[in-house]
UniProtKB/Swiss-Prot annotation:
Chain coiled-coil ranges: none
Family: Belongs to the fluoride channel Fluc/FEX (TC 1.A.43) family.
Keyword Cytoplasm set for record: no
Organism this protein belongs to: Opitutus terrae (strain DSM 11246 / JCM 15787 / PB90-1)
Topology of the protein relative to the lipid bilayer: Multi-pass membrane protein
Residues bound to Na(+): G77, T80
Keywords: Cell inner membrane, Cell membrane, Ion channel, Ion transport, Membrane, Metal-binding, Sodium, Transmembrane, Transmembrane helix, Transport
UniProt GO MF annotations: fluoride channel activity; metal ion binding
Gene Ontology cellular component terms for the protein in this record: plasma membrane
Annotated protein name in UniProt: Fluoride-specific ion channel FluC
Function: Fluoride-specific ion channel. Important for reducing fluoride concentration in the cell, thus reducing its toxicity.
Residues passing through the membrane, by range: 5-25, 32-52, 70-90, 105-125
Top-level division of the source organism's lineage: Bacteria
């Protein structure tokens, strides 16, 4: 199968996962703030930090380039969404809700960077374990 097809399949899986999770979060917390997008971006950031480190050449898990592209470009590229974050922030600004817009920008940036770092740290710990 072509690499592009693997990435497309991963993207389809990731986008369906994003739609489901962000919808559940929005149902639970409401839509006055883009909680669903924030949650999927933070979760996706943790997973990519973890997976990238775990499957790096010195990592514990041997995954080929196709598998890495399937997960990181396809699944996680479809799961996370910078464009929705941008549009939702713009909509908050257009509605005059500067506080929530600023909170979305700062919160997303800080939480996603912390999440990718925590994912990396978790995989470093797993990579350092002895044995299988």
């Amino acid at each position: 199968m072509s690499l592009y097809l693997y990435i497309a399949l991963g993207g389809a899986l990731g986008s369906v996962g994003r739609f489901a999770l962000s919808g559940l979060v929005a149902q639970h917390y409401g839509e006055t703030f883009p909680w669903g997008t924030l949650v999927v971006n933070v979760v996706g950031s943790f997973i990519i930090g973890f997976f990238a480190t775990l499957t790096a050449p010195e990592g514990r898990m041997l995954v080929g380039a196709t598998g890495r592209h399937f997960v990181m470009t396809g699944v996680l590229g479809g799961f996370t969404t910078f464009s929705s974050f941008s549009l939702q922030t713009l909509n908050l600004l257009r509605d005059g809700d500067w506080g929530r817009a600023g909170g979305n920008v700062v919160g997303s940036l800080v939480l996603c960077l912390v999440a990718v770092w925590l994912g990396h740290i978790a995989a470093v710990g797993l990579n350092s374990l002895k044995g299988s």
